[in-house]
């Protein structure tokens, strides 16, 4: 089974429905193969908390979080994070701390990270990426 982990930006586009190509690709994949990291969940909820969004968007975020499988941050993800961060620092590669955590979580979960963020492509080998 191929598992796809949506990063925060892709999850936001899914919720907003503003990029048809993402929606088309998403509906072609069984929902039980689509996951997000608990880090992405936290980022989505933070985004709602810091701004006064219309109630409709808040409802859509919560509906999305009910429907998608959310993988908890665990020991395996933390182990991969430590190794990945050390390798990136040694190679002079910088990524935001939360992006680094999401990348590590996708690797630990043996998932393909779905992203449109080119920063993830700088990560040394081991992270599988798809741009939807």
Regions inferred by a protein language model and the residue ranges of each:
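Amphipathic alpha-helical recognition patches that constitute DNA-binding helices
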Residues: 21, 35, 60, 76, ...
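Generic structural signal for small/hydrophobic residues in well-ordered secondary structure
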Residues: 7-8, 22, 44, 81, ...
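Acidic, PIN/NYN-like endoribonuclease modules and their adjacent C-terminal/linker elements
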Residues: 1-3, 103, 107-132
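Active-site neighborhoods of divalent-metal-dependent phosphate/nucleic-acid chemistry enzymes
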Residues: 68-114
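Short, well-structured N-terminal submotif of metal-dependent ribonuclease cores
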Residues: 1-36, 48-65
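A generic structural signal for short hydrophobic patches within well-formed alpha-helices
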Residues: 11, 41-44, 78, 120
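Histidine- and aromatic-rich ligand-binding microenvironments
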Residues: 7, 37, 94-96, 117
